[in-house]
Amino acid sequence: MKSGLFSMNDIFFLVNSIFKYFLILLNGSHLLKLLYSSKENIHIIEGLLCIITGVILKLSLIYIYCTYFMNIYIIKDYRRKNVLNIFNMNNNYKRNGNVIESDDFEYRKLIKKFFFKKVYYSIKKKHKRIELYMLKIYNSNFNYYFCNIRDMCYTIIWYISLYYWRRDTYNMIWGFNKIPTYIYNMLLILLSTSYIDLVMVIISYNKSKYYLMKSKLLIDIFFSAPCTYLFSKFIFVFEHQIDIYFMMGFLRNIKIFLNVSYVRIEHNSILTNTEIKIIRIVLGVLLLCNAFASTIYTIQAIHPYNLDNENFNYFLNSYLDYFYFSIISISTVGYGDIFPINKLSKVVCIIFIFWTFIWVPIQFNDLIISIFSKKKTYGKISMNNQKFILLIGDVEPQQLNVFLFESVAQGNKLKFHLLTTYPINIYDEQIKIADHFCISLYIKNFDLNEKENINLLYSINAQNAYYLFLFSNKFHNGHYNIDTKSFTRLLILKKFLHGKKNAVIELRSNCVSNIVRSIGCENFIIVNLKHSLIVKNIKYPGFITLILNLFTAYNYDISSYNFNDIASYPSLKYIGEFNRGSRTKIFSFIVHKNMVGLIFDKLFYKLYESLGIILVGIETNTTNYYINNKKHKNKNSYVDDNFTTMRKNNMKNKKKKSFKFIYLHLLKKYGHTNHYTQKKKKKKYDNIINHHGSKSKMEYSTQLRHNNKTIKIYDEYNTIETYQNYLNYETINNSRINIYNSDEKKKKYNDVSPTNNILTNYKNGKLHIEKRDDFDNNNNNNNNNIVKSRKKGRENKNDEIINVCININSDIKKKYNNNNNNNNNNDNDNNNIINDHDNYNIYNNLNSNLKCRCLPNTKKNKAQNVNNVTNNKDNDVSVKRIKTHLQDDNTIDNKKELKCYLNLLGKNYAIRDSDKCVVIANSRKVIKYLSKAKSLFWIFEIKSKKKDNISYDLKSVIKTKQTFNKYFTTNIKKKLPTTSIQNNVYVNKNAHIIAMNYHDLFNTYRISRIFTKNNYNYKRKNSRKKHLFRNLNGEFNETKLYHHCNNTHNIKTTDKKNMEKLDKLYFSTKLNSKSNTNIHIHNNNNNNNNNNEHYDDEIKTYYFNLTEKNSHLLLNYKKQLKKKNYINTCYSVNKSDESINKIKNMNSDNNNINSNNINSNINNNNNNNTKLNHTLKNRITFSYMEACEKYFPTENRNNKLLLIINCTCNIIQLIKMFNNKYKYNVIILTDEIPTMNIMDLFKYNVVFIKCKILDDYNLINSGLMNAEYILILPTEAKNINEINEIDMNTIIVTRKITHLLKKKKRTYYINNIITELINPSNVIFLEENKMIKLKDKKSSYDDFFPYVNSSQFYSSNIICETMLYNFMTHHKSFTDFSVCTNTLECLIKFLRIIYICDLSKYYDFSFKKIKTFRDLFYFLSKKNIITIGLYRKGDKKVPFYIYTKPNENCLLRFDDIVYIL
């Protein structure tokens, strides 16, 4: 690591920091020089004491402010350690000191071997922290009032000193020799305090234009050391340099005027806003006149030396005359009795008069606007080229907080332009925060939908916006209408932005999301995200806080807590672990060049070992076949499996084309990089059953021989349809080419015989086209024409193969189409011999190299199709290159969206150039280094010593090649030279290419050596065949069955009779799938045995005909049958008495149930029919017991209970996501019942309990003690003024429920309760004993996120829509290392939990070996599981908390819950 750590920004930071501290040192030395130069007026020791007094006074006030008004980590940490030493508890804290680490321990690991860089890093970190706190102190109200008081004291001292000023004429310089010593001492105290303020300004100096517009800073600059030195040496020549501060004292009057004119108006109950503005105008005019008078008095006043008596009267009369002159000059009266004498005084008069003309009308205008109209704008528009974010729509104040803090946390200091429909006065707190952190903010009250004023967008410079965020209003019902309004705004902006795709829109539902995606803009569906997080948090506790900590930039500090009692100290450990985990964030960065080609597993372990970073997954925009291989789900019965496979095949036939390739692990061991193997598509439900009773996959191979040249023609469906396939072939010397013909337009096969014509091969090598009917008749006689796949594999096992897929030219199609039509018209010509070789020309371009790659396996171990490309100009055959994991994709389509693939352990995935690594880390600096460093060899344990003068880049290529060469066999290494991963693989021009499919590899090598049972179950097909025909053997042979299938007709599912037959058929097949006996179904009426046997025959034939011939009809029938059987089995409402009797009798005959029991059950069902028919209309009860009796079936009463308090309009979406597997009973306790689909209520086991008051009785009566999970939702707010009232009602209910559970229930867990709030600031009222503490003491993070100090947030028991906007701000407009939206979706989908106590199922797990988080991390990684964090129990103060990415030495506990991927 010799380079890559110091960048240009680091060098600029060093230069800037050195210059800042040089200015601080210069001003301090100048202050001491002032003391040394004025020995006659000031004693040195007294002056030093005065300077020390002023510095101590200012620092003490800062300390008081930091202790009681702000939380600074250093001071609070020092004080906390001293308190712990007093109580002898510091030893316990030191034992757990490794738990609470710095947030940048990863960066310290990075630079642990480099001393100077380590020193630089520590200085930079401390400087950034000091800079942040100095900025906060300097812009605080406390410092503002202190500076005003200091300036007033300075002005008073200056007015007192005017009495001692002397000069005889105005051309002379004032003499200050008569000023007493105590005035000099007081001046030194004030100068020393102002020096501390100047130090804070210099340290926190970041934005020059923002600071230069500050009037108080401009005046303070005149009192800095460089300015005073220039004035005292070149402009005003004084014997003592300290006299310059008396000469420039009039500037303090101007500063007081400016502070009063732009004072921060606070809300109070004494004065209104209008009264404050009137007082400010009056005081401003008086201070302006005073500043004018003091300036003119300094320029042209006279106070002679010879006046000994009446000095004070002379001074007072002289100053009043100039005050009178300032009033008549500002009021433009101009009597002329007093006038400016010299040019300097005239310039001053002009400046003050113009200043008055500008300032006074502006103040009166603001006064009139505040009285008669509402304020519609705030701030200034940024017209420069600085980046700014444009927020449009119904932006709430808390949402704006998220955006402001994200800018502060990332250090971007972006400007924000806000076009909102809300009034500006609700953003008062946000305006203070923006001014506090020096963020430029412009707010405009404007609705873009109403006026569609494009000129306004131009006026705010919206066309140059870095990014646009559009918000929706959540206080109105009808999400579709809200989204339509937001989409209208997007269309207006889309037209205005001229095709730019830098907009993000917030939606409330999925209705408009597809349209927004089609435009090319990003969408953020807030309601669906909230529901998914709630559902995930219910099943996996702590999930909400875990995800928020990963995607939010805030950092917590222990110092933000006020521990006033000794009982709070045990919670310090838990809070410290939570705070350390909250610093962990998720990042994505473009892979480094040294990472390209590495296997994911190796990179995963190396990053964790060297830097402590967890590699979670990758983001890529290329198609990858290795990722997310889902295991095949086991089906309970053959019928369900049969239905699903038929449906999948129908979908594949529509989307996919002809050919697929063999599995990747075969090609790794036995294939060449230039070879491929062809896998035939499976033929299901189209094959002909021979008399032996097994399906045979038929292959019809043809050979065309001419002058020792062989061409093999092979069709994907084993037949070549003469009206679709067109081939031309020309002779090539000493070449053998295999042609795989793929149909561009497939024909849907619904009959047993799909085509009429078939191409057969005779011994003489000629192609013969005959009809399918004739071929079927001669099928048994001509068995030689049917070539078995395994036999063919034995013949061609030694041939070499290349993947060449050919599309036939359209001109040849037309030519051959006419010939085919002519052949079909001749009915008597059954044997048409094709002798004309000119009709079969193969356009093979030998000059172009055919590129090919091995194709890895996809989700179900199947290969992808090869798309054929035809060159219409030259009639040449072009082959599309197939990329693999061995090939770097350098040409990537930027239009593709990034997709995230998590946990690629064990999938043998190799990193590409275009990939982005998704990591979980603590330090943003480390991520920046990994993406931009010049060399990363030291991380991967590559020696830095050079050998044979080989550069590091070449060395990395050699290392990468050696890793990839391990996957090839020795035969390949002998035949081909080793090439780099970036080079393309070409086919030799004179290579012999012979046809071969995947069956050859099965016959050549034993399957047991190739596959394992986990990778490929080669016995699966045979087992399914046996399962299909297991219940059909016995009395019937397959030929008769096949003949019967051809004679049957399609069954229409709409007929009632056919439906009854299918009912019997379905139930019989269900019973047969469970037992090995033959099918025996008895009718309800008395029939003879012959009818029963004949009925059995019909059932079997119908069953086979449905599965083989009428699959699409059976699928439609199954859909109807599911709905029918669901209502029959669960509710028995829509069934008639006869149908119920039929089903009961069928079940009784098969299961030997007594008829008496059946009759009793039928009677019970008939009695319940009336009740159930009534409950279909309304599912409203008055108690939990009544709901169990009426609405919850007996089989569902043991399900877990979810209690939802209050009902929203979209509650059914939440229930569908939570109860998708019907394993929960849902009770909604509400006052108003919304309109919902009655079938959804039955399907998802939902019952309403209506009550007006949520008292203790109604809560317990609704099943509170039996509820496994409790979800408390707020009622819908109509406007923004109802938010706090609704939240307080929700908080009261939450605290009441927790009190009841503690009182009534022994096993009470706080993590089973989730409360949703509208305003997250109200979370402080959820804390029983911390409301006043949290309200009085705020940190910098509490200004933005008031919920961070709540134990409810620790345990992930609260959620708010405003909290979810942190995901929206984790965007590329704020940071360079943001993840894509698909990463968030994948985390919500794939993140799981494991209990530590359940890890004993692994035979190699033991707490003796696995004690720390590091041990657990490596143990689960061997199982291809990535560990992210822990969910732990605490104490009464902190019941539960999340510990994200714990320390490596963190000790595990038996009750921990582990978050895994």
Curated annotation (Swiss-Prot):
Ranges annotated as spanning the membrane: 44-64, 142-162, 183-203, 218-238, 242-262, 281-301, 349-369
Keyword Cell inner membrane (UniProt): no
One example GO MF annotation: potassium channel activity
Membrane topology: Multi-pass membrane protein
Keyword Transport appears in the UniProt entry: yes
GO BP field: potassium ion transmembrane transport
Location(s) in or outside the cell: Membrane
Chain residue ranges for the region called Disordered: 771-794
Domain of life according to the entry: Eukaryota
Name under which the protein is recorded: Potassium channel K2
Gene: K2
